[in-house]
């Protein structure tokens, strides 16, 4: 062992690793009569809230649509309107209540969230409930949103990191649904219809599948 290595070993041996402090949680789990699971984790010191809806629906659940990216397409279309709000009204309602919103789709889940002042919790929950369980899927927005995603797919194919990621997952999970990209393959994506999406929503976006 060299002098440098000896000195480094000595320093590491005597280095005190600080104890990590984790905040205590008051989280509780409740199941409603309709099967919806509700998780509450209050923090009275923070006057803000994060309202979220986690749907157990991602690319690995797509079954006959595997590789088409229907979960991701559905995530986009949910923002386009509900039985109660049109797309602009959703945005205006959230912003007027001081909220910021977004969503994402992964292999095993789709998550929608609105963050903002705690006093707006009822508004946020109302909007989230409408979006997740009562989307209207306006026909005039369907092809528009498909074109948005087509551009996303093209951009991904032009990105070396994205292509490497696809290659990694397709190799590591060659016999698993994770081998398929969440956003989908262009040829399969192009075949998706509005009716496909509506049926997929009815099958997957249930209260028992959401928390």
Q: What are the functions of these language-model segments?
A:
Residues 1-13, 25-26, 31, 39-42, ...:
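Charge-rich, well-structured scaffold segments of protease-associated domains
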Residues 19-22:
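Short loop/turn motifs at secondary-structure junctions and domain boundaries
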């Amino acid at each position: 062992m060299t002098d440098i290595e000896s000195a480094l070993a000595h320093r590491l041996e005597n280095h005190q690793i600080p104890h990590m402090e984790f905040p205590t949680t008051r989280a509780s789990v409740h199941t409603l009569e309709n099967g919806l699971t509700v998780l509450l984790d209050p923090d009275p010191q923070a006057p803000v809230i994060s309202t979220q809806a986690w749907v157990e629906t991602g690319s690995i659940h797509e079954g006959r649509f595997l590789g088409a990216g229907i979960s991701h397409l559905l995530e986009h279309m949910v923002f386009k309107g509900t039985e109660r709000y049109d797309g602009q009204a959703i945005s205006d309602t959230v912003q007027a209540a001081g909220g910021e919103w977004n969503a994402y789709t992964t292999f095993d889940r789709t998550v929608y969230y609105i963050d903002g002042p705690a006093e707006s919790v009822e508004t946020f929950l109302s909007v989230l409930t409408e979006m997740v369980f009562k989307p209207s899927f306006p026909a005039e927005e369907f092809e528009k949103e498909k074109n948005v995603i087509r551009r996303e797919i093209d951009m991904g194919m032009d990105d070396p990191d994205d292509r490497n990621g696809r290659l990694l997952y397709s190799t590591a999970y060659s016999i698993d649904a994770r081998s398929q990209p969440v956003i989908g393959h262009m040829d399969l994506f192009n075949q998706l219809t509005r009716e496909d999406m509506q049926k997929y929503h009815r099958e997957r976006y249930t209260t028992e599948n959401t928390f």
